[in-house]
Amino acid sequence: MRLDDIIGDVIFLSFKNPERMQAIGIKELSGHYMLKGYDQMGLWLEHPGIKIQHMEDENGRPLPADQQFHEEIDAVFMVHWDNVDNMMHYPKRKGFDLP
């Protein structure tokens, strides 16, 4: 199997050093992520969710609690090759092996 064949699929990945991922909100030792691509530096994976809470208006003034809101941001993050411990793909598993 080649990585090119599973781009766009959901894979299982465990990290050698999960502390390196904490700065971007990934706190788990392992998880399931959509593989978006790869390069000489590592794997590009879809971030499971970044939420930003808007607490100020456009002028920097605090918003009342009932006007504050959350925004979900789409993001892709990199796992360097030296931080990949294990990787697993699920051929033909519904919801994981995507066309």
Write out the residue ranges for each language-model feature.
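Eukaryotic intrinsically disordered, low-complexity regulatory linkers and tails enriched in Ser/Thr/Pro
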Residues: 1-99
